Amino acid sequence: MKITKLETIWIDEQFNTLWLRIHTDEGLIGLGETYYVPRAVAAVIHDVFANLLLGREVFDIENHWNNMFSTVNFFGFAGAEMRAISTVDVALWDLLGQYLGQPIYNLLGGRNRDRIRIYNTCVSHGPHQDYHAWMEGRAGQLAEELLATGIRAMKIWPWDQFGVSLGGPIGRRAGVG
């Protein structure tokens, strides 16, 4: 199965999220995603990685990763280049899972637990408008809303004024910190 097209998608409602759809000659489409500065990541995918991927075998996942990494590793181990590699990697694993009729976790060694706890990251997705609540100093209100939906943990940004937005130890004692 060959890679025929790399399609990047971002929408105004989630302005920092990028989705990648990798199309194949057999009609399967793999989906990958990343967060932050989507146009920069899309540029790396289209301007740098397209030549490494288009027309190539989908299932050479490790080889694709190594080729992408060796092409951009002089930029370091972070930034748009690494997010682009990750996005492509996820989409390729998605394609392999679809082709084999298996969830990706089976391909990566199998399930090791039946349930996992989830947490919320303040990035304005869904009904909570998390990022805006955090920026406007309403993190405590956001935490209460999340608790009401069963989400018991929230990741806040390291530069957040924790003592102000959640009331520090007082907020924790109140069940929202």
Label every model-predicted segment:
Residues 1, 86, 114, 149:
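Structured loop/turn residues at beta-strand edges in well-structured enzyme cores
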Residues 108-115:
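Flexible hinge/switch segments at interdomain interfaces of large molecular machines
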Residues 25-100:
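Metal- or metallocofactor-binding catalytic centers and their adjacent structured scaffolds
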